[in-house]
Amino acid sequence: MEGRLDDYRWAGPYIASRQVVAVNENSDIYKLSDLEEKNLAVQSTTKPEGIFLDRTDERIPKLGNLISLGHRELIYTFLGKGYVDAVGAHEESVVQYMKDYDTSFRILEEPLMVVGIGVAFAKDDDRGICEQMDQTLEEMRQDGTSLKIIEKYLDHPQKYLEVDDLGY
């Protein structure tokens, strides 16, 4: 939804999405400011790439090098081999990679970005579906249906439902 709020009518957000930084477990990087002059890998054309290229967020330090790679798996290989100090990626991408390849990285507590995911409708859509969808998504969150669905696929499902403070 972020960056497109004025382009569509939105139902939701129904889930929170986090862009994060991950490091090797023994890294001395614990917060975003520790990335100053460090080397970081991202997948090209992703939110983390834009965050580190644009540096419009005052929390984002000047890196030594930003390495943009065409394939997601490569950023984790670069991290594991020590070619970079950290990676920027979608949190679930990091978690899934660790599961798939039985490896461990440490995700920094401070996220790069937290955004809401919603359902977009055309601005001129007047069928009332957007409002019905928004109401249904909220009911599903309140009655626990969303939690039951998310916990089938993601660890720590409750944090993905923390959408009230996103400001939409």
Segments from the language model and where they lie:
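Periplasmic-binding protein-like
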Residues: 15-23, 99-138, 156-168
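Extended ligand-binding regions for polar small-molecule ligands
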Residues: 26-29, 33-47, 119-158
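Beta->alpha turn/N-cap motifs
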Residues: 1-2, 25, 43-46, 71-72, ...
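Short helix-initiation/N-cap motifs at beta->coil->alpha
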Residues: 66-77, 115
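Ligand-binding cleft/hinge of the Venus flytrap
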Residues: 11-12, 48-69, 98-102
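A ligand-binding cleft/hinge motif common to bilobed small-molecule-binding domains
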Residues: 1-7, 51-54, 78-113
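Acidic, polar ligand-binding/catalytic clefts
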Residues: 1-34, 106, 111
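Solvent-exposed, polar/charged alpha-helical surfaces in well-ordered, non-transmembrane soluble domains
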Residues: 20, 33, 50-54, 73, ...
